[in-house]
Amino acid sequence: MTDQSNIKDANVYDEHGNPMNREYDLGRDGAFIGYRILIGQFYTSGDMSAPIEALKMKGFHVDNVKNEFEFISKLRFNDYQIAWVISASSIESPKFVSTLIDFHSAGGAIFLFADNIPYICHASEFLYEKFSIILTGNYPGNKTLRFRENGHLNAGYFGQHEIFTGIKNLFEGVTICHPVYLKPKNQTSMITVATATDGNPCIALFDPPSDSTEGRLCLDCGFTKLFINWDSPGTARFVLNVSCWLAKANK
Protein backbone atom coordinates (compact mmCIF):
# COMPACT_ATOMS: atom_id res chain seq x y z
CA MET A 1 0.00 0.00 0.00
CA THR A 2 1.39 3.41 -0.92
CA ASP A 3 -0.01 6.90 -1.02
CA GLN A 4 -3.64 5.88 -0.57
CA SER A 5 -5.73 7.71 2.03
CA ASN A 6 -9.18 7.43 0.50
CA ILE A 7 -9.54 3.66 0.24
CA LYS A 8 -12.98 2.78 -1.09
CA ASP A 9 -12.91 -1.01 -1.37
CA ALA A 10 -12.08 -2.14 2.17
CA ASN A 11 -14.27 -4.84 3.66
CA VAL A 12 -14.64 -3.09 7.02
CA TYR A 13 -14.23 0.51 8.19
CA ASP A 14 -13.98 1.80 11.73
CA GLU A 15 -16.33 4.42 13.17
CA HIS A 16 -14.06 7.18 11.83
CA GLY A 17 -14.16 6.01 8.22
CA ASN A 18 -10.67 4.51 8.23
CA PRO A 19 -10.29 0.99 6.77
CA MET A 20 -9.69 -1.67 9.39
CA ASN A 21 -7.09 -4.46 9.27
CA ARG A 22 -3.34 -3.96 9.05
CA GLU A 23 -3.19 -4.76 5.34
CA TYR A 24 -3.96 -1.07 4.77
CA ASP A 25 -0.87 0.10 6.67
CA LEU A 26 2.11 1.42 4.72
CA GLY A 27 4.32 -1.49 5.79
CA ARG A 28 3.50 -5.18 6.16
CA ASP A 29 3.65 -7.01 9.47
CA GLY A 30 7.07 -8.59 9.98
CA ALA A 31 8.66 -6.71 7.08
CA PHE A 32 11.03 -4.65 9.23
CA ILE A 33 12.99 -7.36 11.00
CA GLY A 34 16.55 -6.06 11.36
CA TYR A 35 15.47 -2.44 11.80
CA ARG A 36 16.18 -0.96 15.22
CA ILE A 37 14.37 1.94 16.89
CA LEU A 38 15.63 3.78 19.97
CA ILE A 39 12.94 5.70 21.85
CA GLY A 40 14.02 8.56 24.07
CA GLN A 41 10.95 8.97 26.26
CA PHE A 42 11.93 12.13 28.10
CA TYR A 43 8.31 12.89 28.96
CA THR A 44 8.16 9.93 31.28
CA SER A 45 4.55 9.95 32.48
CA GLY A 46 3.03 8.15 29.50
CA ASP A 47 2.61 4.42 28.99
CA MET A 48 4.42 3.40 25.79
CA SER A 49 3.40 -0.27 25.79
CA ALA A 50 0.83 0.03 22.98
CA PRO A 51 3.10 1.83 20.47
CA ILE A 52 6.01 -0.49 21.25
CA GLU A 53 3.92 -3.63 20.75
CA ALA A 54 2.56 -2.23 17.49
CA LEU A 55 6.09 -1.51 16.23
CA LYS A 56 7.16 -5.04 17.09
CA MET A 57 4.30 -6.39 14.96
CA LYS A 58 5.98 -4.74 11.98
CA GLY A 59 9.27 -6.42 12.88
CA PHE A 60 11.07 -3.48 14.48
CA HIS A 61 13.38 -4.08 17.42
CA VAL A 62 12.56 -1.37 19.97
CA ASP A 63 14.51 -0.06 22.96
CA ASN A 64 12.84 2.52 25.19
CA VAL A 65 14.95 4.66 27.54
CA LYS A 66 13.88 7.49 29.83
CA ASN A 67 17.04 9.49 30.45
CA GLU A 68 19.27 11.44 28.10
CA PHE A 69 22.55 9.91 29.16
CA GLU A 70 21.46 6.36 28.35
CA PHE A 71 19.89 7.61 25.11
CA ILE A 72 23.11 9.34 24.05
CA SER A 73 25.22 6.29 24.87
CA LYS A 74 22.97 3.89 22.99
CA LEU A 75 22.61 6.18 19.99
CA ARG A 76 26.37 6.57 19.68
CA PHE A 77 27.42 2.98 20.12
CA ASN A 78 24.53 0.84 18.92
CA ASP A 79 23.22 0.27 15.44
CA TYR A 80 19.90 2.10 15.29
CA GLN A 81 18.28 3.24 12.07
CA ILE A 82 15.57 5.35 13.74
CA ALA A 83 15.38 7.48 16.88
CA TRP A 84 12.15 8.63 18.47
CA VAL A 85 12.41 11.72 20.69
CA ILE A 86 9.49 12.46 23.03
CA SER A 87 10.13 15.92 24.40
CA ALA A 88 10.16 17.07 28.01
CA SER A 89 10.33 20.56 29.52
CA SER A 90 14.14 20.78 29.78
CA ILE A 91 17.34 19.22 28.47
CA GLU A 92 19.85 17.87 30.98
CA SER A 93 22.85 16.98 28.84
CA PRO A 94 24.73 19.60 26.80
CA LYS A 95 25.62 16.77 24.40
CA PHE A 96 22.05 15.79 23.58
CA VAL A 97 21.43 18.06 20.58
CA SER A 98 24.86 17.54 19.01
CA THR A 99 24.53 13.77 19.36
CA LEU A 100 21.15 13.82 17.65
CA ILE A 101 22.46 16.06 14.87
CA ASP A 102 25.41 13.71 14.29
CA PHE A 103 23.04 10.73 14.15
CA HIS A 104 20.80 12.49 11.63
CA SER A 105 23.69 13.75 9.50
CA ALA A 106 25.03 10.20 9.23
CA GLY A 107 21.74 8.87 7.88
CA GLY A 108 19.75 8.20 11.03
CA ALA A 109 16.03 8.92 10.79
CA ILE A 110 14.20 10.79 13.55
CA PHE A 111 10.60 10.94 14.75
CA LEU A 112 10.24 14.10 16.86
CA PHE A 113 7.31 14.34 19.25
CA ALA A 114 6.33 17.53 21.06
CA ASP A 115 3.19 18.79 22.77
CA ASN A 116 2.07 22.02 24.39
CA ILE A 117 4.58 24.35 26.06
CA PRO A 118 6.69 23.45 28.03
CA TYR A 119 6.89 19.91 26.59
CA ILE A 120 8.70 20.98 23.44
CA CYS A 121 12.30 21.31 24.56
CA HIS A 122 14.10 18.33 22.99
CA ALA A 123 12.40 18.67 19.62
CA SER A 124 12.60 22.47 19.56
CA GLU A 125 16.29 22.68 20.44
CA PHE A 126 17.19 20.14 17.75
CA LEU A 127 15.06 21.91 15.14
CA TYR A 128 16.57 25.27 16.05
CA GLU A 129 20.13 24.03 15.59
CA LYS A 130 19.33 22.07 12.43
CA PHE A 131 16.77 24.21 10.60
CA SER A 132 16.36 27.51 12.54
CA ILE A 133 12.89 26.36 13.58
CA ILE A 134 11.42 26.68 17.07
CA LEU A 135 8.25 25.26 18.58
CA THR A 136 5.67 27.21 20.53
CA GLY A 137 1.99 27.16 21.39
CA ASN A 138 -0.65 25.47 23.51
CA TYR A 139 -3.66 25.06 21.25
CA PRO A 140 -6.54 23.04 22.76
CA GLY A 141 -7.20 21.04 19.62
CA ASN A 142 -8.83 17.72 20.43
CA LYS A 143 -10.40 17.53 16.97
CA THR A 144 -10.07 15.26 13.96
CA LEU A 145 -8.24 16.21 10.78
CA ARG A 146 -9.64 15.10 7.43
CA PHE A 147 -7.93 14.02 4.24
CA ARG A 148 -8.05 16.33 1.25
CA GLU A 149 -5.73 15.91 -1.70
CA ASN A 150 -3.46 18.98 -1.78
CA GLY A 151 -5.28 20.25 1.31
CA HIS A 152 -2.31 20.04 3.68
CA LEU A 153 -2.11 23.83 4.15
CA ASN A 154 -5.80 24.23 4.98
CA ALA A 155 -6.93 24.32 8.61
CA GLY A 156 -8.16 20.91 9.72
CA TYR A 157 -6.77 18.90 6.82
CA PHE A 158 -3.86 16.68 5.83
CA GLY A 159 -2.77 16.03 2.26
CA GLN A 160 -1.57 13.15 0.14
CA HIS A 161 1.55 11.40 1.43
CA GLU A 162 2.74 7.87 2.13
CA ILE A 163 2.53 8.42 5.89
CA PHE A 164 -1.24 8.85 5.58
CA THR A 165 -1.77 5.56 3.75
CA GLY A 166 -5.05 4.03 4.91
CA ILE A 167 -6.05 7.15 6.86
CA LYS A 168 -9.04 9.32 5.98
CA ASN A 169 -9.49 10.89 9.43
CA LEU A 170 -6.71 11.60 11.93
CA PHE A 171 -6.77 12.91 15.50
CA GLU A 172 -4.75 16.13 15.78
CA GLY A 173 -3.85 15.90 19.49
CA VAL A 174 -5.16 17.42 22.69
CA THR A 175 -2.99 20.44 23.49
CA ILE A 176 -0.56 21.00 20.67
CA CYS A 177 2.30 23.24 19.61
CA HIS A 178 3.40 24.37 16.17
CA PRO A 179 6.67 25.21 14.38
CA VAL A 180 7.85 28.77 13.73
CA TYR A 181 10.33 29.26 10.90
CA LEU A 182 12.89 31.88 11.91
CA LYS A 183 14.36 31.96 8.40
CA PRO A 184 11.80 31.99 5.57
CA LYS A 185 14.05 29.94 3.28
CA ASN A 186 13.83 27.02 5.72
CA GLN A 187 10.12 26.65 5.04
CA THR A 188 11.19 24.52 2.10
CA SER A 189 13.29 22.25 4.33
CA MET A 190 10.57 21.01 6.67
CA ILE A 191 7.44 20.52 4.58
CA THR A 192 4.02 20.85 6.23
CA VAL A 193 1.83 17.84 5.45
CA ALA A 194 -0.96 18.49 7.97
CA THR A 195 -2.47 21.65 9.43
CA ALA A 196 -4.25 21.75 12.79
CA THR A 197 -7.73 23.15 13.16
CA ASP A 198 -6.26 26.48 14.32
CA GLY A 199 -4.47 26.92 10.99
CA ASN A 200 -0.96 26.15 12.23
CA PRO A 201 1.20 23.24 10.98
CA CYS A 202 1.00 20.16 13.19
CA ILE A 203 2.87 17.52 11.16
CA ALA A 204 5.96 18.31 9.09
CA LEU A 205 8.51 16.22 7.22
CA PHE A 206 12.10 16.47 6.06
CA ASP A 207 12.97 14.21 3.14
CA PRO A 208 16.59 14.78 2.12
CA PRO A 209 17.68 14.85 -1.52
CA SER A 210 19.03 11.61 -2.94
CA ASP A 211 22.64 12.79 -2.78
CA SER A 212 22.41 13.70 0.92
CA THR A 213 23.78 11.57 3.75
CA GLU A 214 21.04 12.77 6.10
CA GLY A 215 18.11 10.71 7.31
CA ARG A 216 14.43 11.41 7.03
CA LEU A 217 12.60 13.27 9.79
CA CYS A 218 9.03 13.70 10.98
CA LEU A 219 7.71 16.22 13.51
CA ASP A 220 4.42 15.57 15.31
CA CYS A 221 3.13 18.37 17.54
CA GLY A 222 0.74 16.44 19.81
CA PHE A 223 2.40 13.51 21.56
CA THR A 224 -0.39 12.55 23.97
CA LYS A 225 -1.75 10.48 21.08
CA LEU A 226 0.96 7.97 22.02
CA PHE A 227 -0.45 7.50 25.50
CA ILE A 228 -4.04 8.38 26.37
CA ASN A 229 -5.23 8.76 22.76
CA TRP A 230 -3.72 5.69 21.10
CA ASP A 231 -7.20 4.53 20.02
CA SER A 232 -8.15 7.94 18.56
CA PRO A 233 -8.88 8.25 14.81
CA GLY A 234 -5.98 7.07 12.67
CA THR A 235 -3.36 7.38 15.40
CA ALA A 236 -1.93 3.86 15.52
CA ARG A 237 -1.72 3.55 11.74
CA PHE A 238 -0.17 7.03 11.43
CA VAL A 239 2.58 6.29 13.95
CA LEU A 240 3.38 2.98 12.28
CA ASN A 241 3.28 4.48 8.79
CA VAL A 242 5.72 7.21 9.78
CA SER A 243 8.11 4.67 11.29
CA CYS A 244 8.00 2.59 8.10
CA TRP A 245 8.55 5.71 5.99
CA LEU A 246 11.50 6.74 8.14
CA ALA A 247 13.06 3.36 7.45
CA LYS A 248 12.97 4.27 3.73
CA ALA A 249 11.31 0.96 3.13
CA ASN A 250 7.95 0.39 1.51
CA LYS A 251 7.46 -3.28 2.26
Segments from the language model and where they lie:
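Aromatic-Pro/Gly-enriched surface loop or interdomain linker
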Residues: 1-81, 115-116, 208, 226-236, ...
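Short alpha-beta junction capping motif
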Residues: 31-40, 74-124, 220, 242
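Short, well-ordered coil/turn elements that cap or connect secondary structure elements
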Residues: 32, 57-59, 105, 187, ...
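Solvent-exposed, polar/charged alpha-helical surfaces in well-ordered, non-transmembrane soluble domains
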Residues: 49, 53, 98-101, 125, ...
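Sec-exported extracytoplasmic/periplasmic mature domains
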Residues: 56-60, 101-109, 128-132, 247-248
